[in-house]
């Protein structure tokens, strides 16, 4: 498997014609407008990258964008891979391994998620401070690749506290209300039942979604700093029947997008 990682990294490296990116950024459902904030140097379609999967979900692109954002070099992933698409975990997290081999030290992850905290509203931005992994397969299951990290990585600070503090400071300056909470990862593809939403809340979750957790686990396994945010695209609970659709999720994300863009632009600019 490591040979495949090296082969893919070697292919992508030829397109990184200037400085090594400081950030890798993964765009979630409906968050494609963020790619318009990047001044592109090179676009790399997934279809041409050796060993790379393809995203099949509406609202997700299928390319890497190497360029600059707020004066920093970034490698942006327009379209992620989900466990519910039928991919094994090593495919879902394949790009994260490549980011590490390219020398990228920081990861920004975004998603749209369902809110279960009664204090949340549709359109809220939630900074992820921790997660609960309820995926049926662990991304580090199997033989450990020592070149990436230890067999038993620590996850007590999966999400970088300094990055969270910076985002909170910026949001306060911009007048953007933020939530902060625990993201629960489920495999999907069905949206949760009211009872499942209730379970998520009962075990300590504030929001629930179908991505992010595997990517973060692998990023931390190899020592990357991680910052993650969710847009609350719908609400659910044991006494709420949300009747949510993917179109409604995308609409909620679009309405919040200007605030997200402003936050991410300044975050990248000021991050150290």
Regions of interest found by a model, annotated:
Residues 1-155:
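Metabolite-binding pocket within alpha/beta catalytic cores that recognizes anionic/polar moieties
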Residues 11, 15-18, 162, 166-177, ...:
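Generic non-transmembrane alpha-helical segments
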Residues 100-103, 201, 220:
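Non-catalytic positions within long, well-ordered alpha-helices that form the structural scaffold/packing
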Residues 105-106, 206, 225:
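Short acidic/polar active-site loop segments enriched in Thr and Asp
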Residues 164, 170-206, 264:
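Active-site/ligand-binding-proximal alpha/beta "capping" segment
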Residues 210-248:
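Zn-dependent metallopeptidase/amidohydrolase metal-coordination segment
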Residues 236-272:
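His/Asp/Glu-rich mid-to-C-terminal helical/loop segments that flank catalytic regions of hydrolases
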């Amino acid at each position: 498997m490591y040979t495949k990682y090296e082969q893919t990294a070697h292919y992508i490296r030829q397109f990184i014609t200037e400085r090594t990116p400081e950030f890798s950024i993964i765009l979630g459902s409906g968050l494609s407008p963020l790619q318009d904030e990047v001044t592109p140097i090179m676009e790399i379609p997934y279809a041409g990258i050796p060993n790379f999967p393809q995203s099949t979900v509406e609202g997700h692109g299928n390319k890497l964008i190497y360029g600059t954002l707020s004066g920093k070099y970034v490698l942006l992933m327009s379209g992620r891979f989900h466990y519910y698409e039928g991919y094994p975990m090593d495919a879902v997290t394949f790009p994260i391994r490549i980011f590490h081999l390219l020398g990228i030290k920081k990861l920004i992850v975004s998603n749209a998620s369902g809110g279960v905290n009664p204090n949340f509203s549709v359109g809220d931005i939630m900074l992820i401070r921790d997660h609960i992994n309820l995926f049926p397969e662990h991304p580090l299951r199997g033989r450990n690749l020592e070149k990436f990290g230890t067999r038993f990585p620590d996850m007590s600070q999966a999400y970088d506290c300094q990055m969270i503090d910076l985002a909170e400071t910026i949001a306060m300056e911009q007048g953007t209300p933020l939530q902060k909470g625990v993201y629960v990862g489920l495999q999907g593809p069905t949206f949760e039942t009211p009872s499942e939403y209730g379970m998520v809340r009962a075990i300590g979750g504030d929001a629930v979604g179908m991505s992010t957790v595997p990517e973060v686990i692998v990023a931390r396994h190899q020592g990357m700093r991680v910052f993650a945010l969710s847009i609350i695209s719908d609400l659910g609970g044991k006494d709420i029947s949300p009747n949510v659709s993917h179109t409604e999720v995308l609409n909620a994300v679009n309405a919040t997008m200007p605030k997200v863009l402003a936050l991410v632009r300044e975050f990248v600019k000021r991050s150290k």
